[in-house]
Each structure stands twice: as C-alpha cells, then as structure tokens.
A protein has these predicted regions:
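Conserved ABC ATPase "signature" region
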Residues: 16, 20, 27-45
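Hydrophobic anchor residue at the start of the ABC signature
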Residues: 63
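Conserved catalytic motifs of ABC-family nucleotide-binding domains
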Residues: 70
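Catalytic Walker B motif of ABC-type/P-loop ATPase nucleotide-binding domains
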Residues: 74-77
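C-terminal coupling/interaction segments
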Residues: 161, 185-229
Length: 229
C-alpha cells in the first residue's frame, strides 16, 4: 500500500495531471478539480507537495484523483492502512458521502469494525470467496452460533488463565480474549456453570453476559473451521 501519486508534484499538479489523463476537457477541468478538492476537504493543501502530506491527507488526495472523472465504481485496497484513527474515521465519512451520491465501493480491509460499516461483506480465504452477505446475515449463520449454543462475554481478572480453564470445559466450544473480556461459545444455559467453575478456581464476581456475534467472531469461526478440514 505505497503512495501511488507523484510526491514531487503539488496537490493541484497531481489533480491536473490525472484530470488530463482521464480526458477531462480543458473548459471543464478547473471546475471539476475544485469540486473534488472541496469534496475531499483538501482546500488548504493546494500548493503542498504531495510527498509532504501526512498519511490521511495522502489518502484523501489519492481518492480525489481517482474521483476526478466521476466513476460509478471504485476499488479501494486497504485505504486506511497506516493512518491514525481520526483520519480513518474522516476518510470513512467521506466514503459514505460519496456512496450517497451513487458511487459504489469495493473495499478490502483487515479491520472488522470497517467491515461492519459496509452494506455487504465477503470473506476471502486462500483466494476463495467462502461467504457473502450483509453483516447481520453473516452473524446469523448456523455455522457461527450452531443450534444449542450461545455466545457469551465473560468479565473477570487474569484473562489468560481464565481462558485456559474454560477451554478445558466440555460445554465450551471456543474461547478467546477480546479486549478486556473473554468471548465464549458454549452450550445454551451454561452461564451459571461458567460462573461456578471460575469461582471455584479463584475468580469471584465473574460476570457472564449473552452477546451477539461480531464480524470478527464470524471471520475467526469460518477460518478455523476450514483449517480443521
């Protein structure tokens, strides 16, 4: 994901170059460039060399160059890789604005929170599309939470050792650390068993809460099942 524009040209010069490459007539060129500059929010950087921009502003410039000829479909390969959280959110807000104007985006990402923002999500594993649907459709797949099971969030101290304890229980199918808690796939109605087993192992006041699966749960479950085949 290297910066693909010309670092020794200014923002305006890069946009002018791409407008000419895409065949935008001279009489319309300046107006269209000003439109994409405003849309990408890079008005204050017209004369800045592209190579001197931060990661987030480089991505905005790259998007502006790609939009200058009014495409209806765009492919974005990890567009937020290497940029800070604020720039990442601002870039996604820009993509939503463009989507509302009729532009369709195909986005590749390793960030599951970004996948949650998409209308449809496809998982590719070893170059094969293994599933595709809306985020809600994927979370409701029987393969993700098989009948008779439930996904639970377990809040307790010493997560690594608690995870090892639960992983050995016959009623637990899967357990992983997720931020400051454990995500557990277990038999339905096993909340009290989890609390009792952890309390017996020295974990008082354990909280066990039913939760819906996340897209990360979907991704991990699907890939693990295929690794086991």
């Amino acid at each position: 994901q290297q910066f693909s524009l010309y670092p020794d040209l200014t923002v305006m010069e890069n946009l002018t170059f791409y407008a000419r490459i895409y065949g935008i007539p001279r009489r319309n060129r300046r107006a269209r460039i000003e439109e994409v500059i405003a849309g990408a929010g890079i008005q204050d950087y017209r004369k800045r060399l592209a190579g001197q921009l931060s990661g987030g502003w480089k991505q905005r410039l790259a998007l502006a160059c790609a939009l200058v000829h009014r495409p209806r479909l765009m492919f974005l390969d990890e567009p937020t890789a290497g940029i800070d959280p604020v720039a990442r959110r601002e870039l996604w807000n820009l993509l939503f604005d463009l989507s509302g104007q009729g532009v369709t985006f195909f986005v590749t990402t390793h960030y599951m929170d970004e996948a949650e923002r998409c209308s449809h999500v496809g998982y590719i594993y070893f170059s094969k599309l293994i599933v595709c649907g809306t985020p809600n459709e994927l979370k409701q797949l029987d393969e993700i939470s098989p009948p008779g099971t439930a996904r639970l969030e377990v809040r307790c101290p010493r997560l690594p050792s608690a995870m090892r304890i639960l992983a050995e229980k016959p009623y637990v199918d899967d357990v992983t650390i997720f931020a400051d808690s454990l995500h557990v796939l277990a038999e339905q109605g096993s909340e009290h068993r989890i609390s009792a087993d952890l309390e017996a192992a020295g974990y008082p006041q354990t909280q066990v809460i039913p939760i819906p699966p996340t897209l990360e749960d979907v991704f991990v479950t699907l890939t693990q099942r295929r690794k086991a085949v």
